[in-house]
From Swiss-Prot:
One cellular component (GO) term of this entry: cytosol
Organism lineage: Bacteria, Pseudomonadati, Spirochaetota, Spirochaetia, Spirochaetales
Cited function: Pyrophosphatase that catalyzes the hydrolysis of nucleoside triphosphates to their monophosphate derivatives, with a high preference for the non-canonical purine nucleotides XTP (xanthosine triphosphate), dITP (deoxyinosine triphosphate) and ITP. Seems to function as a house-cleaning enzyme that removes non-canonical purine nucleotides from the nucleotide pool, thus preventing their incorporation into DNA/RNA and avoiding chromosomal lesions.
The keyword Glycoprotein is annotated on this UniProt entry: no
Protein's name according to its UniProt entry: dITP/XTP pyrophosphatase
Keyword field: Hydrolase, Magnesium, Metal-binding, Nucleotide metabolism, Nucleotide-binding
Gene Ontology MF term list: dITP diphosphatase activity; ITP diphosphatase activity; metal ion binding; nucleotide binding; ribonucleoside triphosphate phosphatase activity; XTP diphosphatase activity
Xref: PANTHER family: INOSINE TRIPHOSPHATE PYROPHOSPHATASE (PTHR11067:SF9), INOSINE TRIPHOSPHATE PYROPHOSPHATASE/HAM1 PROTEIN (PTHR11067)
Catalytic reaction(s) noted: XTP + H2O = XMP + diphosphate + H(+); dITP + H2O = dIMP + diphosphate + H(+); ITP + H2O = IMP + diphosphate + H(+)
Cofactor(s) needed: Mg(2+)
Self-association and partners: Homodimer.
Species this protein is from: Borreliella afzelii (strain PKo) (Borrelia afzelii)
Keyword Mitochondrion: no
Amino acid sequence: MKTLFFATTNENKINEVKNILDIPNLNLIVPQNFNIKETGKTFKENSLLKAKALFEILNKNQNVFGEDSGLCIEALNLEPGIYSKRYDTYKLCKKLSTNEKNQLILDLMKNEKNRHAYFICNISYISKNRQISNFEGIIKGKIALSLNDDKNHGFGYDSIFLTKNNKKLSDLTLEEKNKISHRGIAFSKFKKFLLESLFNS
């Protein structure tokens, strides 16, 4: 049995990651009350920041990884970007619900012809021997014209993001989403790496 620590407390991310990795004899542990300020200027910096913080907490003798992801919209100068999770407080200095955050994006995009956007996911892994590895996944698409929350398989900005097949990420099942999403792509690379390194050591 191999143990791997995930530097997050986001339940939605945990569920997606467990579904993607799905490696026999892998014990994925999520720390309780893990909270760290995301002060990095890029997704990579933030994912590494989380991984390093957890690595320190665990006395530098466990395999850990951190992940950072977000939505980048061309017409908004690639915002919300690294502020995706906290775009409400960044933009309006107040907390909004998920639907309200999605509506905020749609309001900012009102009458905007260029609706191109992409989701990005970055993973930073630190092994027991202090080797650092990085993995990234991107899905390109467009911002929808309206908010449709009839189906709610996803989370975050899934309900306003249209894939190349003109389907919202929120319309997909978890399995369907993980085959094409930024997180699915990044963690598939990470899974391959783990099987070749961690499980062959």
